[in-house]
Amino acid sequence: MSDSQTLVVKLGTSVLTGGSRRLNRAHIVELVRQCAQLHAAGHRIVIVTSGAIAAGREHLGYPELPVTIASKQLLAAVGQSRLIQLWEQLFSIYGIHIGQMLLTRADMEDRERFLNARDMLRALLDNHIVPIINENDAVATVEIKVGDNDNLSALAAILAGADKLLLLTDQQGLFTADPRSNPQAELIKDVYGVDDALRSIAGDSVSGLGTGGMSTKLQAADVACRAGIDTIIASGSKPGVIGDVMEGNSVGTRFHAQASPLENRKRWIFGAPPAGEITVDEGATAAILERGSSLLPKGIKSVTGNFSRGEVIRICNQQGRDIAHGVSRYNSDALRRIAGHHSQQIDAILGYEYGPVAVHRDDMITR
């Protein structure tokens, strides 16, 4: 083995269940064995696990419940304890302790909470404890959810300062087309940047048991790679897949990390789930993308959502394309009032000002 590395392994519901209605315990045993082997070799392992809802449904005998958020939260509340108990039992075979971390979007949006979560995660790793991370589905609503465990795993990789992020799924990797419907589809082995062509290939394929598809894995890979973290999408059923990834063997689709990764603050900006969205005109779009300029109120066309000053927001062009994320200097109500106006008018409109820009270029990451 090479020098010690930190690996985040994301296990989707389809991997943990094998596509069935219940957890595939035999397969989970094998995944734990692979992780334990790496742990014994001195590597640091973080697991982002799906499956709480599936575990809850299995434990309750597959009840017929309405398809509502409340039903999912009920199943998650039951399943989270069952799932963590399973991880604890299996890792204890190898004398490895685990620590559970349940996160929501609020833990990522607020810079102080982000740093607290980072410190907690790294403390677990420093003490040779394997963190088991999941979104807190039992309490999270649409407004506070990260949305899927693919993006959560990218955030976990940033928090952990990971070297690699492994997204295990029921597919071999990213293909040129959907291999389930197109026999001519070819595996894409290496990716050096996520673009619109790749996003189009990924489409909206979603497993019936989980909340993530290939498109969310692409989002996660983009976030992680821009933070300097190699990301691999591979099949969870491939024998020895976790060890192969740590050895650097060719497996699945590898997204190569950017040579010049983002600084820590900008990693947070890029990774934090946006609290709201603003649409900007063509002039502002060109200024941001071509000249690296700050966003002035004059260029804002509309504001969506309710957010506070200091929260991360999404900046979109008039075609709806996500062009940047940044920290807003004003709250959503204030931005609605000053949108389309010159910076010199801010004080007259609001009765105060926090400077002439809506989002400063130092607090902005282009997509």
Curated annotation (Swiss-Prot):
Primary localisation category: cytoplasm
Sequence ranges assigned to domain PUA in this UniProt record: 275-353
Gene3D superfamilies: Acetylglutamate kinase-like, PUA domain
Pfam families: AA_kinase, PUA
Catalytic activity: L-glutamate + ATP = L-glutamyl 5-phosphate + ADP
Pathway info: Amino-acid biosynthesis; L-proline biosynthesis; L-glutamate 5-semialdehyde from L-glutamate: step 1/2
InterPro entries: AceGlu_kinase-like_sf (IPR036393), Asp/Glu/Uridylate_kinase (IPR001048), G5K_ProB (IPR041739), Glu/AcGlu_kinase (IPR001057), Glu_5kinase (IPR011529), Glu_5kinase/COase_Synthase (IPR005715), Glutamate_5-kinase_CS (IPR019797), PUA (IPR002478)
Residues bound to ATP: K10, T169, D170, T211, G212, G213, M214, S215, T216, K217
GO biological process: L-proline biosynthetic process
Binding site for substrate: S50, D137, N149
Cellular compartments annotated: Cytoplasm
This protein's UniProt keywords: Amino-acid biosynthesis, ATP-binding, Cytoplasm, Kinase, Nucleotide-binding, Proline biosynthesis, Transferase
GO molecular function: ATP binding; glutamate 5-kinase activity; RNA binding
EC primary class: transferase
Its EC number(s): 2.7.2.11
GO CC, alphabetical: cytosol
Function: Catalyzes the transfer of a phosphate group to glutamate to form L-glutamate 5-phosphate.
Family: Belongs to the glutamate 5-kinase family.
UniProt name for this protein: Glutamate 5-kinase
